Amino acid sequence: LVDRVRLSAHLAVPHGRDVLYIVEERAPGAPALVTGVDVRLPMHLTASGRAILAALPRPQVRALFPDRDAFVHRIEADSEIDRYSKLRAELDATLTRGYALERGSITPGFSSVAVPVLDHRQWPVAAIAVTFRDAEVPVDRLAGLALEVREACTRLSTRIHGRSR
């Protein structure tokens, strides 16, 4: 994936309300990212986490985020997800788009696109994401980039006896 898109990529798994990054491959010349191996970040703020959450049944998402205290705040922004209604709107947009998108919620000036990896029950067991400087990837390239990520997820899902969404 990194060789094809020439952007850094990572694999994250759900860990409570967080995602845990278990693999990171940095593109040549790309800057170090906060998403290194063994780093945990709030699921609702990351593209990887949003991809996983969007693939979960609504009651499961609600169980993870029962009230405003469940939402961690990282960067003050107008678009900050700080309540369930905002999270639900973002997850619905993710489902409509076909991929999760995070723009500056983790690191200002950087964005990520992610797709879930599903098991044989269609349950999200992980997500693959690519992260890039906003200036490197024009908005009209995001859908194509998401297709590349989806292909990687499909291959991984197949290897663990799942299928892609």
Show where each model-derived region lies.
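Residue-level signature for short turns and capping positions that connect secondary-structure elements
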Residues: 26-27, 48, 135
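Short, solvent-exposed recognition segments
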Residues: 30-106
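Generic beta-structure capping elements
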Residues: 22-25, 55, 67, 127-133
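Residues embedded in well-ordered beta-strands
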Residues: 10, 20, 51-53, 111, ...
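Residue-level recognition of conserved beta-strand positions in structured domain cores
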Residues: 13, 23-24, 35, 45, ...
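Intrinsically disordered, low-complexity terminal regulatory regions
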Residues: 1-26, 59, 144-165
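Extended hydrophobic
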Residues: 77-153
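Structural detector of well-ordered beta-strand residues that form the stable sheet scaffold
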Residues: 10-12, 42, 102, 127
